[in-house]
Amino acid sequence: MRIGHGYDVHKLVSGRKLILGGVDIPYERGLLGHSDADVLLHAISDAILGAIGEGDIGKHFPDTDPAYKGADSIKLLMHVMGLARDRGYAIGNVDATIVAQRPKLAAHIPLMGENIAKALETEASRINVKATTTEELGFCGRGEGIAAYAVALLQRRHELSPETREVLETR
């Protein structure tokens, strides 16, 4: 078993879409970044990369590379999962927290979980996403940005239950 932790933050600005967990969230501002700036998927990607000892997303998808301009972070997460899979790992579980004063995200969390589970080739029951505010404290509380934290537990594929291995083999 291996565990990794990830964190990401992006500034909220006008003229950008707000994408979290691969979901387009209706809001008057979006996150500024080289890619689609999906802080949730970036934090999860960093957690997985940390668990396999492969650095962070900046190493794999540098913001100086035009190939990643406007990149879909679901595709980046799928690439990261491929690196873990190539090393014999599967997702044990992912637990992630989005920190945002606004907008309210509860209604979007189920779809975020589904998107993440699909990208990570696992069951939705292994993915937990939650959202919290900072009670109007700090940059998130002032609505200047959104942050996300994630922890990923990876298991060797042979350590998974026979039922889970069967599900993964059909994907």
UniProtKB/Swiss-Prot annotation:
The keyword Metal-binding applies. Its cofactor is a divalent metal cation. 4-CDP-2-C-methyl-D-erythritol 2-phosphate binds at residues 8-10, 34-35, 56-58, 61-65, 132-135, 139, 142. Keywords: Isoprene biosynthesis, Lyase, Metal-binding. It is an enzyme of class 4 (lyase). The record marks 34, 133 as: Transition state stabilizer. Binds 1 divalent metal cation per subunit. A divalent metal cation binds at residues 8, 10, 42. InterPro entries: MECDP_synthase, MECDP_synthase_CS, MECDP_synthase_sf. PROSITE patterns: ISPF. It catalyses: 4-CDP-2-C-methyl-D-erythritol 2-phosphate = 2-C-methyl-D-erythritol 2,4-cyclic diphosphate + CMP. Homotrimer. Involved in the biosynthesis of isopentenyl diphosphate (IPP) and dimethylallyl diphosphate (DMAPP), two major building blocks of isoprenoid compounds. Catalyzes the conversion of 4-diphosphocytidyl-2-C-methyl-D-erythritol 2-phosphate (CDP-ME2P) to 2-C-methyl-D-erythritol 2,4-cyclodiphosphate (ME-CPP) with a corresponding release of cytidine 5-monophosphate (CMP). HAMAP family: IspF. This is 2-C-methyl-D-erythritol 2,4-cyclodiphosphate synthase. It comes from Geotalea daltonii (strain DSM 22248 / JCM 15807 / FRC-32).
